Amino acid sequence: MTKIIFATGNKDKLREIKEILSDCDVEIQSMKEAGINVDIVEDGKTFEDNALIKARAIAAHTDAIVLADDSGLEIDYLNKEPGVYSARYMGEDTSYDIKNNNLIERLDGVPKEKRTARFVCAIAAVLADGRELVTRQTMEGYIGWEIAGANGFGYDPIFYLDEYGCSSAELTPQQKNAISHRGKALRAMKELLMKVL
């Protein structure tokens, strides 16, 4: 069984990744489970940069494959804010209820056709031999007028999908994994890993 360390402390992301890779013969551990405690400064200018920064930092402490992601929300009307600062938007200690309400307020009076947005996820892998792989995928939607749903996390409750007629937080985990930016990026990474392992 191949060991993969996922560079995150976010239990929601870890759960999502374990669900998506559940059909693979891999053991997925968090940094904490692997006994790795490293402070990582995510100062990249792109999602891909930040994913690689994290993966490289963890790979320096293990012989296992390391996966790291960086993801966030881009709102076109707000010049792609919050972007790579999605987790730190309004401060890292600010709740997502407050962040989500702030974004809805900033879009007050903006018509639906100008509320376009996307979730972006870049996933980087550093293999035991030092090779690096990167994938990037998106999930397109728009910012709604209200918070709805309890199945997601982060910005999911304000991110709406026309094809489902609901927010990302109202999807079942299976629906979300099938279409999400992280799900698509992980499946693309899975394909790359299968070619090189």
Label each PLM-derived region with a short phrase.
Residues 2-5, 11-197:
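Anionic-ligand binding patches
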